[in-house]
A protein has these predicted regions:
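Non-catalytic accessory segments flanking enzymatic or RNA/DNA-binding domains
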Residues: 1-127
Length: 127
């Protein structure tokens, strides 16, 4: 069985510069990023975070849907025309802290945060 994650990322409209936060489920984050970028040409994605449950192996999709139902009133006003894939998974900018708190309450921990990750530096010259 493939490793599962709940991911969160920042989403920004390339034209209006409007920002929102996206929460979703995936078992292949690299493929999901490519799918989002290819399908939603008017949006940029950044600062990905991956959340993993401490003991759960299955049920990630159910937890993601539970969070979406609970937070429906905070959805960003993005239409299907501008974002064909995943427009119902985007929330108002600044709501990511509440989403992280809900994930933490459900037992998820952040295992990767792109905004704080720094790739290893190789020295320019080695003697």
């Amino acid at each position: 069985m493939a490793e599962q994650f709940i991911y969160m990322c920042n989403v920004r409209n390339k034209h209006t510069k409007e920002s929102s936060v996206k929460l979703g489920y995936t078992s292949n984050i690299l493929q999901r990023i490519k799918q989002l970028e290819k399908s939603n040409i008017h949006y940029e994605y950044s600062d990905f975070r991956l959340f993993k449950h401490e003991s759960k192996i299955i049920g990630y999709l159910f937890d993601e849907q539970r969070i979406h139902v609970r937070n429906r009133k905070y959805l960003a006003g993005i239409s299907r025309d501008s974002m064909p894939v995943g427009y119902t998974e985007c929330y108002e900018w600044g709501y990511q802290y509440d989403l992280v708190n809900q994930l933490t309450y459900l037992g998820y921990t952040c295992v990767y945060d792109e905004s704080t990750y720094k790739p290893p530096q190789t020295p320019m010259f080695q003697w």
